[in-house]
């Protein structure tokens, strides 16, 4: 459903955000 899609998107964004914090460009 749409809820799981939103959760998946948020999870991806969170992972990307963590990588950005750990390894700033």
UniProtKB/Swiss-Prot annotation:
Antimicrobial peptide. Keywords: Amphibian defense peptide, Antimicrobial, Secreted. GO terms for cellular component: extracellular region. Its main location: secreted. GO terms for biological process: defense response. It is found in: Secreted. Coiled coil: none annotated. Belongs to the gastrin/cholecystokinin family. Magainin subfamily. This is Xenoposin precursor fragment BM2. Expressed by the skin glands.
């Amino acid at each position: 459903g749409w809820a799981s899609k939103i959760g998946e998107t948020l999870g991806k964004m969170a992972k990307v955000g963590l990588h950005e914090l750990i390894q700033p460009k």
